[in-house]
A protein has these predicted regions:
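"…centered on the first transmembrane helix and the immediately adjacent amphipathic helix/loop
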Residues: 1-74
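Membrane-helix interface segments
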Residues: 4-10, 85-92, 115-119
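Small-residue faces within membrane-embedded alpha-helices
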Residues: 12, 73, 94, 98-102, ...
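Small-polar-interrupted transmembrane alpha-helices in polytopic inner-membrane proteins
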Residues: 14-19, 90-110
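Membrane-interfacial alpha-helical segments at the cytosolic side of multi-pass membrane proteins
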Residues: 68-83, 127-143
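Post-HEXXH active-site segment of zinc metalloproteases
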Residues: 76-84, 89-98
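Interfacial helix-loop-helix junctions of multi-pass membrane proteins
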Residues: 102-126
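Short, charged juxtamembrane terminal tails flanking transmembrane helices
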Residues: 145-149
Length: 149
């Protein structure tokens, strides 16, 4: 079993708790926050002369799912594979962790008023996490190549 970097494991767990905390916000509060973000993005795009009609509450919510799990993927990979070994004994626990967290997240939402846990969000979350894992390995490879040069 790979050695886990404890400092990064704590940061990773804090990120998971932040995600779960967001899921505990009732639908009205969550929807209000999403609408505020949507209006800010639309206002910015409009001010620079770009099309903004495509930015909807739905798009903002799904991008938030993807982004928070991309960050979690980066952090988890750093915690589970601090040395950049990319071996099965490192990747398997990372993958299980990154599947378990969104599954729990969507289950939490089943019990929060105005929220719904849906499998499509788990899939979006897992895609975000996978993107984070890939980005972390790409960044590590680039940094190692730069040091070697």
């Amino acid at each position: 079993m790979a050695k886990i970097n404890r400092k990064w494991a704590v940061v990773t767990c804090l990120m998971a708790l932040l995600i779960w905390g967001n899921s505990l916000v009732p639908g009205s509060g969550s929807g209000s926050l999403s609408l505020t973000v949507m209006e800010a993005i639309r206002g910015f795009l409009h001010s620079v002369g770009l099309p903004y009609e495509w930015v909807t509450n739905f798009v903002v919510r799904k991008c938030a799912h993807f982004t928070e799990y991309m960050v979690l993927g980066i952090l988890a990979t750093h915690a589970f594979d601090f040395e950049g070994r990319r071996t099965f004994d490192v990747l398997l626990p990372t993958a299980v962790f990154l599947l378990l967290i969104p599954s729990i997240d969507e289950t939490i939402q089943l019990f929060v008023p105005g929220r719904a846990g849906v499998i499509t969000d788990v899939m979006i979350d897992c895609c975000g996490a996978a993107t984070g894992v890939v980005l972390r390995y790409l960044l590590r490879s680039l940094m190692c190549a730069k040091k070697a040069a």
